[in-house]
Each structure stands twice: as C-alpha cells, then as structure tokens.
Swiss-Prot record:
Presence of keyword RNA-binding: yes
InterPro entries: Ribosomal_uS7, Ribosomal_uS7_bac/org-type, Ribosomal_uS7_CS, Ribosomal_uS7_dom, Ribosomal_uS7_dom_sf
Gene Ontology molecular-function annotations: rRNA binding; structural constituent of ribosome
Gene for this chain: rps7
Role description: One of the primary rRNA binding proteins, it binds directly to 16S rRNA where it nucleates assembly of the head domain of the 30S subunit.
Entry keyword set: Chloroplast, Plastid, Ribonucleoprotein, Ribosomal protein, RNA-binding, rRNA-binding
Phylogenetic placement of the source organism: Eukaryota, Viridiplantae, Streptophyta, Charophyceae, Charales
A Pfam entry, by short name: Ribosomal_S7
Subunit: Part of the 30S ribosomal subunit.
Cellular location(s): Plastid, Chloroplast
Protein name: Small ribosomal subunit protein uS7c
GO CC annotation: chloroplast; small ribosomal subunit
RNA-binding in keyword set: yes
Amino acid sequence: MSRRKIPIKRSPKPDSIYRSRLVNMMVNRILKNGKKSLASHILYNAMKEIKHKTKKNPSLILRQAVVRATPKITIKARRIGGSNYQVPVEIKPEKGHSLAIRWLLTASRKRTGKNMVFKLANELLDAAKDTGGAIRKKEETHRMAEANRAFAHFRY
C-alpha cells in the first residue's frame, strides 16, 4: 500500500485577455518547445480573425467548437482470454474537452493554408458549424464505439 498523498488536482488558470480557462488550455496545447508567447500569439490572432469573419464573440465560437467536438464515449483496448477487444467506455467531461482540443489542433495542423493562425481560425469556425476534421474524428470514435457495443460488458 502506498503511503504517498494523493495530489490535489489543480484547475487551469484563466488567461489574461479573455479570462477563460478554455483559452488557456488551448494555448498550452498549441505550445511547442516552451514558446508560450508564440502559442498565445497564434490563438489570439486566430480569435481576431474569427471576430473579423463572423462579427461575433470569438470566445463563444471557441467554446461552441470545443463542445461540438467533445466525444461522450471512447474505446479502450482490453485483453481478455488471449484476444483484444475494443471496449466502449464513457469519458468524463474534462477528458472529453482535452480530447476535443487535441483533435481541433491536429485537424488545423493538417489543413492546407498560409499559416497556423488562419488554419486554426478556419478549423474552429468549421467545428462550430458541425463540420471539419475534429468533428469527423469525433463521429468516427462514436461509430467505433457503436460497432463494438457488444463488448460493453467487459468494462473496466
């Protein structure tokens, strides 16, 4: 039995401009090689681009994009009796949001375009409209979970 204390889960701090934890989570996910100022520059300029294109509040569009890309269920590989089963598992909202942010960023990195600002802005706009690469990934995950529904009784 471990004697170590269970660490208290820290919530992410809100960012300085939009006062949003979601924006800060997004900045930390964009981050590469410790260049946080560049990551925040990319996200803030993408938000300005969204405001310029839609004339709406960009933080609401970001929140809507993340909510629409958030999966409710995922699959985990479970080894039972010498064979691997893809078992559908419900996930917590925090985990779902972090997956959605990750999928939004990978989909925006795969896009063709001038730079990351425009690619991220377009991916967020598409996700808010229920299209785009991140939404496709979410639907694919839900399809896989539905296909493997028979193995749901192997839950963890």
